[in-house]
Amino acid sequence: MKIYAITKKGEHSENEDRILINDTILSDGIFETECNGELKICIADGVGGNNAGATASSFVCENLKNIALIGKNDLIDINSKLLAKSTENVNYNGMATTLSGICIDDEKS
């Protein structure tokens, strides 16, 4: 399977989006790869207007990249960690990101 991903900041000063493809996190540019077997793709879109959207998106993708098949409890745990991180620094107050993703296990598909 061929995988293509593109993300760029556009007119904004910073790109708050992150794309996770297996263990690669893309923050700007074009990515192309081929994959046979397990596939994990996640898109974290930092919430504009909130503080530290890019930090939130990176944090979520970094935490997801080492989990083979992501489950509900993994997402709950990462959300709790993100909420805790938002209290560490006044610049992180209210940081948020959205998350969409898919995991494919070739042996089960």
Predicted regions, residues:
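PP2C/PPM-type serine/threonine phosphatase catalytic domain
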Residues: 1-109
